[in-house]
Regions:
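Extracytoplasmic/lumenal domain signature
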Residues: 1-190
Length: 190
């Protein structure tokens, strides 16, 4: 099945029948729309990326692709747009209404979002690098590279752990050392 929703009682709510995807984002994207929405990418070389109502499965936007769209991302990275922005390898950047606001942006990570620099926008974590999207110039700026540290799971490039460990609402990143002998906890100095 994949691309399905399970209700609070454990029963299936719906299936889009679009199969498995490597990334799915569930949140309240659009402040003017009731309920939660889903941004999902599909590996079936047909359905591309879909933005849908989480409760009903109604597709709000679909960007079809004949490729395996293995990665998509959603985070609030542009303060000029209400709600959460979304993008994928194939879709360019969309606002919470599903409208195109930027084409494919070179180097825009599609891996993880992190609260790093203390402002209300998200930063982007990919491998051992944290970047910030510059919405004015529509480009990505590197904030920090964690030298001597590696991510996990090959192409998935995920940290050992990411979360607010210190308790200041920013998030810390836990990575393994290159020699696999230790774990390193990185804390924002911004």
């Amino acid at each position: 099945y994949g691309s399905c929703a399970i209700d609070h009682n454990g029963k299936g709510r719906y299936s889009t029948k679009m199969g498995h995807g490597d990334a799915i984002h569930l949140t309240h994207f659009d402040p003017s729309r009731k309920g939660l929405q889903v941004w999902d990418c599909h590996e079936n070389k047909r359905d591309g990326s879909t933005y849908r109502d989480a409760a009903t499965g109604e597709i709000i936007l679909q960007v079809k692709s004949n490729k395996d769209v293995g990665r998509c991302m959603a985070a609030d990275i542009d303060p000029t747009q209400p709600g959460v922005e979304m993008w994928s390898w194939e879709a360019g950047m969309r606002n919470a209404k599903g409208e195109a606001i930027a084409g494919r942006i070179k180097g825009l990570p599609t891996n993880m979002a992190v609260w790093w620099d203390g402002d209300l926008l998200r930063e982007l974590l990919d491998k051992n690098i944290i970047s910030k999207y510059d919405w004015k110039a529509q480009k990505v700026n590197r904030i920090v590279t964690f030298e001597g540290a590696l991510s996990n799971n090959g192409t998935k490039a995920v940290p050992c752990l990411q979360g607010d460990i210190v308790g200041d609402w920013r998030e810390e990143v836990l990575l393994r050392s290159e020699d696999n002998c230790s774990l390193r906890l990185y804390v924002s100095t911004i």
